Amino acid sequence: TAFSIDPWLITTEFHKCGRVNFGEKQGLECVAMGVEKVLHKIRAHYAKYGIAHEPYVYVKSDSGTYGMGIMTVKSGDEMLEINKKIRNKMNVIKEGVQSTEVIIQEGVPTVDVVDAAPAEPMLYLVDGHAVGGAYRVNDQRDAENNLNATGMRFVGMCDESEADATHKALPPCQFGALG
């Protein structure tokens, strides 16, 4: 029996912009329009599913971020109004590589919490099988920001059999071990 599922439930909306130079303020109009385009799509999904959360997007380099050159925005106007400090941060990523193309990606609020801090799960797969994992945790960030930043740490991931039923937060365990 076949079934159908809205692809948005398992993927995110995104848009790409090329020929961007944050230092020279070139291409920011494309980024701003892309932000609005993605936000419009997200708002439609939120209305369809009754989600009462303000949508946001990540604007990030398309050449890998290493946790650098990422910003969270809630409107295209924010892109047109960014100050020089933020433009410089977005213009150059790790090892001085200039960011000339960006991805505008739907933001998904972090729902996992470890030690009262937002956390995102990371699973390690070998041959399609989960063999380990950890949570990226950052108590200096909120549920809408990139957790791969200063203050980030990893906490081992356990399966339910290792959890103490009375413990509300995720349990400490051996880093990376599952099952």
Describe these PLM feature segments:
Residues 15, 20, 24, 61-66, ...:
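Generic detector of intrinsically disordered, low-complexity, polar/charged segments
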Residues 37-56, 63-68, 74-157:
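Phosphate-binding site of ATP-dependent enzymes
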Residues 1-53:
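Conserved N-proximal alpha/beta basic substrate-recognition cap immediately N-terminal to
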Residues 7, 18, 55, 118-121, ...:
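Proline-rich intrinsically disordered, low-complexity coils
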Residues 150-179:
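Conserved catalytic alpha/beta cores of large enzymes that bind or transform nucleotide phosphates
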Residues 4-11, 58, 72, 103:
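A structural signal for short, well-ordered beta-strand segments and their strand-loop junctions
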